[in-house]
Amino acid sequence: EYKKYWIAVVAVLIIGFSILGYLGTDVYHQAPPVPTAYVSQDGQVLFTKDDILHGQSAWQSTGGQSVGTVLGHGAYQAPDWTADWLHKEVSVMLDIKSQEAFGVLYNQLGTAQQAAVKEVVKEEYLGSAVREDGTVVLSPERIAAMNATGRYFVELYGDNPDLTLTRDHFAMKDNTLPELQDRIDMARFFFWTTWMASTQRPGTDATYTNNWPHEPLLDHNPTPESVAWSVVSVIILLCGIGVVVWLWSFGKKDDEHALVPPTEDPISKITLTPSQRALGKYLFTILALFLFQLGMGGIIAHYTVEGQAFYGIPLAQYF
C-alpha cells in the first residue's frame, strides 16, 4: 500500500543529496585561494598563510560567528567584519589617493574628481590577483590603508578605553582576545576575507564573493546571475508548494473516512509501564533545564540592549 510512497521518498532523497553533493564539491573546488603571503612591491613579506590561518583560529576562539561574522553569515550581535573592514579600508584608501592626486580628502573633491579617484581604487582592488608564486603584491597605499584599519580591530578586541562604548554596542567584553599577537593575526584573517570580497575572480566579471558585500565605494552590485537565480529559486519554491497542495487536494482517490468519536475516554484505559512511572523523578530536572534555557535566552536577547550587562549586573566581568 505504501510502496509507491517509499519509492517517492527514496527518489527525492537520492536526487536531493546528489545535487547537494555536486554543488558542495563545486564550491570546494572554487573556494577562494589563501595566498602563501602578502608582500610589498619591493618584495618584503607582510604576513603569510600561516598567520591568516592562526588568525582564523584566534577569531573562532572568541565565539566565531556568534559575535560578528565574516563573509555575510550573519550574527545576532556586532557587524559583519568583512563588510565593515572593506568599507573602512576603502574609505582610507580613497583619502590617501585623493591627497596624493589633489592634496585634499576624498569628500572634499568635486564629483568628477571623486569619480576619477574611485576608478583608480577600483582597478587596484579588482586587480589584486594571486601571482604564479602564490603571493599577492600590495601597493604602499593599500598597505597603509590596511594597517590603519587593522589597528582599529586590534584595539576593538583589546581594551582601548576609546572603544568601550563600541564594544558595549557590539556585546563584546573588554579584552575579548587578550593576546596581542592573536589580535594582529585575527586582523590579517579579516583582511584576507576582505581581499577575496574585492578581488576579481579569474575568468569572471565579479569578485570571489559575487560582488558581496554591497559597497558603493567600489560600485559593488549584485551580479545578473545572482539576481536571476534568486528569482528562479523563489519561483521553483512557489511552484513546488502549489504542486504539493494540488496533489493533496485533488490527487486522492477516496475521501477520508469520517471520524467516529469513541464511546469512552481512551486515556482512561492506559496503564503506565514501570519505565513511564520512573520518569516522574526527572520532572524537576526537566523543569530546571527549562528555566535555565529561558534564562540564557533572556540574557542573550538582552545583550542587544546592554552589551556587557544584564539589568545592571556586569556579566562581562565574570564571563
Regions found by a protein language model. Give the residues of each.
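Amphipathic alpha-helical packing elements
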Residues: Y76-Q77, A83, Y311-F319
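Post-cleavage N-terminal segment of exported redox proteins
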Residues: E1-F47
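Gly/Pro-rich turn-and-neighbor structural signature
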Residues: F250-A316
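Alpha-helical transmembrane segments and their helix-start/interface "positive-inside/aromatic belt" motifs
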Residues: Y2-I15, S226-V234, T271-L291
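Structural signature of transmembrane alpha-helix termini at the membrane-water interface
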Residues: S18-H29, V245, G295-Y303
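Alpha-helical transmembrane segments
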Residues: L20, A228-K253, Y318
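Soluble extramembrane regions of membrane proteins in the secretory/endomembrane system
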Residues: H29-V227
